[in-house]
Design a protein with these regions (language model features):
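Bacterial N-terminal signal peptides that target proteins for export
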Residues: 1-8
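Short N-terminal leader segment in a subset of presequences, especially plant chloroplast
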Residues: 9-13, 32-33
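N-terminal signal peptide c-region/cleavage motif recognized by signal peptidases
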Residues: 13-20
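Transmembrane beta-barrel domains of Gram-negative outer membranes and organellar outer membranes
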Residues: 21-191, 195-227, 232, 238-321
C-alpha cells in the first residue's frame, strides 16, 4: 500500500513538474526573414530537468520588393526551417545545449493560399497577383547589378548554435544563457552568415501553479554580438538588442495556450525597412502534453512591424524529456 502511494505521489509530482516546465517554456520563435535568420538570434530556453530533445518545423512565405536610393531588395519565395535541439540539464542548475537547423528554400506552396486569403477578406496583397505563383527570386544589393541572386530551389544545413545556461535567483526563476553560433551552414542559400555570433540573455520565468487553472508569465532581455556576413552587401550592425514577453494558461490538465511578443533591433545600417528597422513578432500557440515525457505545440507567428519579418509563419514543435 505504501509503495502504491509512493508511486502515485511521484507520478503526481512528475506531472506537476512537467506542467510547470511547459507553462514556463517560451515558444521558440526566430525571425525567418532570409537576411536576418542567418544570424544567431538565441531561442529563449529554460533549464530542463534531465535531457530534452526537440524538433521544430516552420514555414514562412516571403514577398517583398523594396528600393531606397542605391539599395534594392527582392524577396519572393518560401523558407522551410527544421531545427533539431538537444539540451542536457545538470543537477547543479546548469545546462548545455546544441541546435542544428536544416533549411529548404523554394518557390513554395503557400502563394495560392495567401492570395485566396487576401481576396476573401479584401486585403491588399502588395502586388502578389502580378507575380507567378511558386516562383523563387531572392536578389539584393545595387539596383542595377545585384550582388546576390538566388532563383533555384536549394536545401542544406544551417549554422550550429552551442548554448550554456544557469539558473539563478532565490527561487531559481532566472535563466542566464550564453550562446555562440558557428558558421557551419551554406551561405549560398542564406542558411549561414559565414561568421560567428555570440549572445547573452536573461530570462525570467514564473509558473503560477496554485491557481484553479495553472498559468505562467515570462520575460527576457538580451544582446547579440553579430559577425560580418560574407555575402550580404549591406553594412551590418555589431550589437543587436533582443527581448521577449509572454504567458501561458493551462486550460485543461493536458492542454494549454500561449501568447508572446518577440522583439529585436535592426541587423543592418540600411534605409530598407525590411532589414533596417526593429522587428516585432506576435505568437499564439496551443500545446498538449503527450504522456509524462512528451509534448507537441502548434503556433502561428504574425509580424507586428510590417515587412521586418515574414507576414505569417506556421510552426509545429515536438519535444521529449527524460
Amino acid at each position: 500500500m505504501r509503495i502504491a502511494k509512493t508511486i502515485a505521489g511521484a507520478s503526481v509530482a512528475l506531472s506537476a513538474a512537467a506542467a510547470g516546465a511547459q507553462l514556463a517554456e517560451p515558444v521558440h520563435v526566430r525571425n525567418l526573414n532570409p537576411l536576418v535568420s542567418i544570424f544567431g538570434l538565441p531561442a529563449w530556453d529554460t533549464v530542463p530537468i534531465g535531457t530534452r530533445f526537440g524538433a521544430t518545423a516552420e514555414v514562412a512565405n516571403h514577398y517583398r520588393f523594396s528600393l531606397q536610393n542605391n539599395e534594392r531588395l527582392r524577396l519572393d519565395g518560401e523558407t522551410v526551417r527544421t531545427n533539431f535541439a538537444f539540451t542536457h540539464g545538470f543537477g547543479s542548475g546548469w545546462s548545455l545545449g546544441v541546435e542544428v537547423p536544416y533549411y529548404r528554400v523554394s518557390g513554395g506552396v503557400l502563394d495560392d493560399v495567401i492570395d485566396g486569403w487576401h481576396s476573401a477578406f479584401g486585403m491588399p496583397d502588395g502586388g502578389r497577383n502580378g507575380r507567378p505563383e511558386g516562383e523563387l527570386l531572392y536578389a539584393f544589393g545595387d539596383p542595377l547589378e545585384p550582388s546576390f541572386v538566388l532563383t533555384e530551389e536549394q536545401s542544406g544545413i544551417g549554422d550550429t548554435q552551442v548554448k550554456f545556461a544557469r539558473l539563478i535567483g532565490r527561487d531559481q526563476g532566472f535563466v542566464v544563457q550564453a550562446s555562440i553560433k558557428l558558421p557551419t551552414g551554406d551561405e549560398e542559400l542564406l542558411a549561414s552568415s559565414g561568421s560567428s555570433d555570440w549572445s547573452v540573455t536573461l530570462l525570467r520565468t514564473r509558473p503560477l501553479l496554485a491557481r484553479k487553472r495553472a498559468a505562467s508569465y515570462y520575460w527576457g532581455v538580451g544582446v547579440l554580438r553579430a559577425g560580418d556576413p560574407d555575402l550580404i552587401p549591406f553594412d551590418a550592425e555589431t550589437w543587436v538588442p533582443t527581448g521577449i514577453i509572454g504567458g501561458s494558461w493551462q486550460v485543461l490538465p493536458e492542454f494549454g495556450l500561449k501568447g508572446q511578443i518577440d522583439v529585436h533591433g535592426a541587423f543592418y545600417e540600411s534605409q530598407l525597412e525590411e532589414i533596417g528597422e526593429t522587428a516585432i513578432q506576435a505568437t499564439l500557440s496551443a500545446w498538449r502534453r503527450m504522456g509524462q515525457r512528451g509534448q507537441i505545440e502548434f503556433a502561428v507567428v504574425e509580424d507586428l512591424n510590417v515587412s521586418t519579418s515574414p507576414d505569417i509563419v506556421l510552426q509545429v514543435a515536438a519535444a521529449w524529456q527524460w
